[in-house]
Amino acid sequence: MPFVPVRDGKSLYVRVVGRGQPVLMLPGLGMHSVHWLPFILPYLNKFRFYLPDFRGFGKSAHIRLNQADVFHNHMEDVQDIIAYFHLHDFLLAGISLGGSTALHLNKEFGLHGVRRYLHIDQSPCVGNRPDWNHGLFGHRQDELFGQMHRLGDLLDEHTALTHIGEMPLSARREAAATLAEIAAGMTGKPLLKPVLRQLLISPGQLTRWLPLSRVDDCRAYLRAYVGGGHDYRHALRQCPVPVTVMVGMKSPLYAPAGQMAIADYAPDARIIRFHKSGHVPLMDEPLKFVRELGLFLNGPVRG
């Protein structure tokens, strides 16, 4: 399994499995390359999968973000992966953060060398705008972004620390309360708040349950998302490849209407609705995901 040199001199881990046409799959926030394996297993004889661990996660956990724009940072790493493996005529897939990274690549440089793109449960515009209310958290964005701002302010007071679990108890209590509010708001389950508040006070539980446990990484992602991110909608009009969009119709993070609006921008888009799924269709409807992934890999029958 190679560690790929990237432009800042670090080495990013990329798991490579299978044989055949190349497929580059970009992970969501906190996801490890190994999480893809059960779903790609049926296709290893026809496709060669390149599965990176993004900076800060999996076997790339030791690599820090090196710029304020996390989306641009990950995009540059993806460019370096493509160049290192000499990928061309390849399939590209991205879920959540990986989807934003792929759309960032399309906006900045285009999807050159990509034959088809699979986009999984991510809005083409994370921040709400006067003409767009389908960003992260939808109509509750101001409320939940306010809580994320408070968490960011708290972390700004502890930049000398490495991990959130190292913060003083009073600060951990405040962070846990804010995280519990955010989680309850995301899921629509207010009864979770007292449970999560107590659970997350423990340093060990903070590290175990949070996808981001480092202070610097958490601050970077909070800034990226609360800042509104990027608007990738209009760049999709020039997207040169067919796009398949997998939508969790019960997604608590991104309104299905906003995800499906990709078809209003991309010249060649196909929408796949996962009616029983939230933000992670591969976990909520795994059999359907494997089946639809196969259709994407082999080229969907369009009609």
List each model region and its residues:
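Flexible "cap/lid" loop of the alpha/beta hydrolase fold
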Residues: R115-P168
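Active-site loop/oxyanion-hole signature of alpha/beta-hydrolase fold enzymes
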Residues: R7, L41, L51-L97, N106-E108, ...
